[in-house]
Amino acid sequence: MSEEKHEIGLEVLGTEECLQLLSGAVIGRVAFQADGVPHLLPVNYAADADGTVVFRTAEHTVLESVGGRPAVFEADGFDAVNHTGWSVCVRGTGRELTGHDTTARRLLELTVIPWAPGQRDRWFAITPDEVTGRRIPLVRAADFGWIPGVVS
């Protein structure tokens, strides 16, 4: 775990921790541009040990446009009671998985179960150029001399 901090108190996560967090979540968001319009869509996904993110979509959806384009995938988790959380971003290029190469066949073996109803037979991956993450750590108010909700 990285001990590096932003000046605003966020912990910068190392690659290994980012990959571990990605492997434990099942929903994330894919951001990309199609026809000059930015899109940000939620997906069920799986990630491999290298941070490649795999998701499924139906025929004739805007998600098909991610193939061959720059894309960003984001997954996160939070604890609303303790005001902590994390976010991991995978920046890379999207591609459709057709099973015609060894990597595609391996990625198609990952378990991705869409929550939304309907058939989703098109598989896509975002191959990472960069994996980054941040965490909002548990902070005790007393450490900073303030109490939430109290104005002095």
What residues fall within each predicted segment?
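Short, surface-exposed beta-strand-loop junctions and turns on beta-sheet-rich folds
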Residues: G36, T61-L63, R140
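Short conserved beta-strand and strand-loop elements enriched in small hydrophobics
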Residues: V30-A31, P70-G77
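Charged, gly/pro-rich active-site loop segments
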Residues: S2-G9, G77-S152
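Structural motif
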Residues: G51-T52, P70, T93, E130
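Short hydrophobic/aromatic-rich beta-strand segments that constitute the beta-sheet cores
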Residues: V54-R56, F73, G133
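Short beta-strand segments
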Residues: A25-A58
